[in-house]
Amino acid sequence: MRNGLKLTYTLLEGTYVVHELRFPEDPAGETENAPSPSRGLHPSESPDGRNILQVDGKWVEIFKDDIISVSAAPTFHSVPCVGYVVNEAPVQGKVDPKLYIPHLKRTGTDMRLMREIQKGQTVTLADGTILEGPPREPGRRIVILGDTHDPSPIEELAKEADLIVHEATNAHLPGVDNRVKMEDTYESVEERTKSRGHSTPQMAGRFAKRIGAKNLFLNHFSSRYSGGDDESSRAIMEAIRQLAVAEFGGGGVVCAKDLMNIEIPPKRSLEEGKEPTVIEGTR
């Protein structure tokens, strides 16, 4: 970005900031939070950018606020590439009112106390009964991979993802795609795809299963697969999806399209009929 703006003598009305994920093999000389004069900034570039160094092969929590945190790790491709993990902060557990209200009614307690219980607080009733609000629950996790034929470096960060976005560049589709070469097999297509730094749907499905993902979104399809709405294109994309399903097993598999939206429901540990933690007092 910096060089592109400099070479084209472009000036911007506002400023921008660049935080760079540094690989161990990157040229030496720039360390984390290097002084701005040593970095040849563009006039529109903020000096607040950071060089973020790897720790144990990963970039952990390169961004964090009260809602989400973002971590990253390299993925194997023909050139340096990165995958990202977006973690939602723990959220307050859901209250099932019917499990608490009887205790409040029995002791003549103001129902407004439910607000405190919903916040996860512990309250003591008039007879000494202690009601504990629901604990905070893990937030959602989304994994977004770039080009890759092996994303194993991100596996630890990606465990139990609610959704993983994984490329599926090429596929062997006999009987569906009339451009299939007679000599090709599932194995030969996978080896050729890997040699170019990419993945097949089966590879995506296997990795999603390995990390315990709940949903798999396939993307980065070869341009030979148009993804159109005609019957032939739909059949091809469904065949690609089924190849991933066969390896992934349980969970949802979707062939992504541009501008597609997906809502990931919040995690809820509350089981139907499960009693809250109630400690009877001695009063």
Predicted features along the sequence, with ranges:
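A short helix->loop->beta-strand "cap" motif at the edges of active sites that frequently abuts
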Residues: I211-L216, G249-G251
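Binuclear metal-dependent hydrolase catalytic cores
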Residues: M1-I144, P151-E156, R224-R283
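Helical hairpin unit composed of two closely spaced alpha helices linked by a short loop
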Residues: H172, E187-S199
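Short, flexible, mixed-charge acidic loops at enzyme active sites
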Residues: P174-Y186
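Active-site metal-binding loops of divalent metal-dependent hydrolases
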Residues: T75, G146-T148, A168-N170, A204, ...
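A short, acidic, amphipathic alpha-helical segment used as a generic capping/interface helix at domain edges
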Residues: D150-P151, R196-R210
